[in-house]
Amino acid sequence: MNNFPWLTAILLLPISAGSSILFIPQRGNKAVRWYTICICLLELLLMTYVFYYNFQLDDPLIQLEEDCNWINLFDFHWRLGIDGLSIGPILLTGFITTLATSAAWPVTRNSRLFHFLMLAMYSGQIGSFSSRDLLLFFIMWELELIPVYLLLSMWGGKKRLYSATKFILYTAGGSIFLLIGVLGMGLYSSNQPMLNFETSANQSYPVGLEILFYFGFLIAYAAKPPIIPLHTWLPDTHGEAHYSTCMLLAGILLKMGAYGLVRINMELLPHAHSLFSPWLVIVGTLQIIYAASTSLGQRNLKKRIAYSSVSHMGSTIIGIGSMTDTALNGAILQIISHGFIGAALFFLAGTSYDRIRFLYLDEMGGIAIPMPKIFTMFSIFSMASLASPGMSGFVAEFLVFLGIITSPKYLFIPKILITVVMAIGMILTPIYLLSMSRQMFYGYKLFNVPNSYFVDSGPREIFILISILLPVMGIGIYPDFVLSLSVDKVEAILANYFNG
């Protein structure tokens, strides 16, 4: 049973089954929706079954490994495998994509293409998280960008083409650095390309070259989480995209950059990472303050939530730069936690817009009375986003805090400064989230819209929101549910630094 290529099956199922969508009749929108949801559910069940029976929690090594020679000419292998670092993002991808396909129920224009692109994106993301070959990682990284660009440019607001072009310029520009880094590492000191992650991890480079590789990969990944100053595509894109696409962007796409930083920069380039880590902590700290302050000034609801995503990813970057197992576990937990919370907030923003047709906060007001269910869920997820105790965000940010305070790498005064600045960011977070809730839901009704728009959340929407709320509260109450996946792998990664 262990010889069966489970990861290949998990990776290829969405895109191969999705290809059949194109043969469904043009007017069969309902059939397309149900078919896509069934594929996503089947994929999620397959994933859960395979990981439950074949994944050992206490083993930090690569599991479910597959290695097949693909192109002999330059020793290119189809090499897949998962460990404690990748299993969480893969399960998150399955969960959020399944809910995003349910959220896309109202999409009727070109619905066959829309759902096919969602499934193609699904395969690309699973491929990125499970690749064990540098070139395969790059191919999957790029494969995932094409459907995202088409989803952004074809469905959304009036400026969707502008925002999609901005997105592809940032991410494709970063991909050039990723390709150069992959080829540089693969071709270094060998006539035969060495693209295997394990071989690259044991390879030592001159310090100058390692710093060059590290910086190239950092630029490639900085556009995704995003890290300031490469973040400006995110508010525009979220402001224009359809909310089901926003769920995939906030829930999964932003996490790929943080995953790449740990997987390649930390694991394969440890000496350069120990030099760059203080700068990552500084940038992450500034990002929390900058994005929280900017979010407060946004009139557009979706842009305000987008800047809150940038702010929350700052704590992930601090965790990656802290060089302690506590903070790195917190960063990985924040990746999972924000995946759920960000997806839920964008879904709520989109469903609210579908009803009231306003995105600007100063045009809203008094929505709580006609739409109490949306008001309740928005309030709960706002509390989760501002790291309220009992929610997953609290545990993640607390671990990052604790990790940076106890880090032996930094002196006492810098640690105090970083902690104070992070605390200021955590004070700003409830200010912009609670003011957003006040402007939307409280006060008088400032607009004249026919009452037919004021239909509260239906069963489908409530089901999606409760499905996201349960893991958010579950992780908040029992964080070991996620931490047990990554704790051994994190120890193994950091052992390279303290032994070397």
Swiss-Prot record:
Main subcellular localisation: plastid
Catalytic activity reported: a plastoquinone + NADH + (n+1) H(+)(in) = a plastoquinol + NAD(+) + n H(+)(out); a plastoquinone + NADPH + (n+1) H(+)(in) = a plastoquinol + NADP(+) + n H(+)(out)
EC number of the protein: 7.1.1.-
Keywords of the record: Chloroplast, Membrane, NAD, NADP, Plastid, Plastoquinone, Quinone, Thylakoid, Translocase, Transmembrane, Transmembrane helix
GO molecular function, one term: NADH dehydrogenase (ubiquinone) activity
Major enzyme class: translocase
UniProt cross-references to Pfam families, sorted A to Z: Proton_antipo_M
Subcellular compartments: Plastid, Chloroplast thylakoid membrane
Transmembrane segments: 4-24, 37-57, 80-100, 134-154, 167-187, 208-228, 242-262, 272-292, 330-350, 386-406, 416-436, 462-482
GO CC, one annotated term: chloroplast thylakoid membrane
Similarity-based family: Belongs to the complex I subunit 4 family.
Protein name per UniProt: NAD(P)H-quinone oxidoreductase chain 4, chloroplastic
